[in-house]
Amino acid sequence: MTSIRATTAVFAALVLITTSTGTAAASTDPHREAVQRQLTAAVASGAAGVQIRVTRDGRQFTARAGVAKLGSPQSVPLNGRFRVGSITKTFATTVTLQLVGEGRIGLDDPVSRHLPGLLPDGDRITVRNLLQHTSGLHNYTDDIPRDPKEFLPRRFDHHTALGTVRKAAAKPLLFPVGTKSSYSNTNFLVVQLLIEKVTGRSWRAEAHRRILGPLRLTDTEVPGDNPFILGPHARGYLVVEGKPVDVSALNPSMAGAAGEIISTTADLDRFHLALLEGRLLAPAQQAELTRTTAVSPGYGLGYFKMTSSCGITLWGHTGGIPGYLSVMLSSANGSHRLESSLTTGTALDQQVLTKVVDSAVCG
């Protein structure tokens, strides 16, 4: 990997693989043993450390492999904190859909209704287009330096959602609004601005008020400008001139509602189960969450689906931010769930990681 952009690119190519990184305690359970074997293989293929939480048919276990810090014998904390990257989008979508249910914003409202003048095409781009990645907006993370030597000295810079969106919106649309799908982090910075405009409070405050507080996600944080991961955590790395460099500390304001959240596998599992069980959204908005279209067949609203090798359809999100790859996936009924974090500074073997996912989901 060569930068935040490269991190995202690698993760996109390995969507399923991250799903299964973790280790299990010694056990005669064949499922746990299968997961452990694949975790060991993931570390052998380049991961510094991995942790995973797996739930299947009411039985749950946690597992890990590798180390929390290169050069140290310390194991990855089993419920250590990590940067979840784009899993943040599912949190932001949940807040937005709650506002839709309250009648404060509409999915088919044009952005210009709430944020006049922000986007040149704001009369045509709707809230739904943003959540579905069909807006055509330029992806601002494509402009982040590819070379980690350029990224490293900038990683503590402060960024505002408004400033970042304005720069991205100055570039031409990738396609006419609604005609195609293209993943763009810019969409969710606009979502952040919408949440703040409609509520009069920060996106951070709304996430705490609506999700983190009610669900008691005490190990989950919307950090803003705080560059540090508080509490036990594994270090994340980028490779610079062939050597891993610790990038655990960085200013997550560059990610905002597109990817700034810090959490744990336990908190992500609690959040995802609440979402699946309809405890966070009204039925109408719950249905919208997983509604796909011909233009965006694999992505609902801040939420995507994939199919495991054993035919189980999974919903959730993955995330990539410098130093960390993460995953949160579940079957529609919640019987099969997994949350995982992987720390690495190298490209990993896709087949190895795909096997990890399959071991966790299919066993």
Predicted regions and their residues:
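Secretory targeting and sorting signals
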Residues: M1-S27
